[in-house]
């Protein structure tokens, strides 16, 4: 749905008898990797008025928003980038609550230059405040489980820690929250 407006995406879903969709909500301005930068809802500029319009548009077409989607590497080794990614994730949580979607889909992330054990330590620092905020807003977070392999130098770990049942269990032990789950697709 890259290049399509929010309305075009919803209309496509309705015309093809789809009941719900995950709506891309990347920051405005694009990004360098495939699919990054696609944004059908500008969560940074979302107002109550715009949220009402979005909900009414979907309702008229009998299409539900299942989640708001943003897939950055929240364990990015560059701290400036990491903080920008996390700041947008908070906006996604706010928008999900405002739209009464109450679900976001994202990645846990991974520093591809560190071991699983080292990445789990970063998870302990980065994710508890995000989850606490989501819990306070009544928003669930579903983590996608693909490895995010884009270039040869990311093998074997990729940019997402949530790639195997063993890693899932370790992350869920650290982040014991009823608001955290897996987006299995």
Predicted regions: what they are:
Residues 2-3, 44:
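Short, N-terminal intrinsically disordered low-complexity segments that are rich in Pro/Gly
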């Amino acid at each position: 749905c890259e290049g399509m407006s929010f309305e075009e995406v919803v209309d496509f879903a309705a015309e093809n008898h789809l009941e719900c969709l995950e709506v891309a909500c990347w920051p405005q301005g694009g990004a360098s990797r495939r699919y990054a930068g696609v944004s059908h809802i500008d969560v940074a500029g979302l107002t109550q008025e715009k949220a009402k319009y979005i909900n009414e548009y979907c309702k008229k077409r009998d299409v539900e928003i299942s989640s708001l989607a943003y897939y950055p590497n929240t364990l990015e080794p560059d701290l400036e980038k990491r903080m920008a990614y996390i700041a947008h994730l908070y906006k996604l949580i706010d928008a999900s609550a405002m739209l009464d979607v109450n679900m976001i889909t994202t990645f846990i992330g991974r520093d591809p230059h560190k071991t699983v054990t080292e990445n789990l330590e970063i998870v302990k620092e980065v994710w508890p405040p995000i989850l606490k905020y989501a819990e306070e807003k009544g928003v669930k977070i579903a983590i996608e489980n693909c490895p995010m392999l884009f270039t040869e130098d990311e093998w074997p770990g990729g940019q997402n820690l949530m790639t195997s049942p063993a890693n899932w269990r370790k992350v869920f032990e650290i982040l014991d929250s009823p608001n955290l789950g897996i987006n299995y697709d």
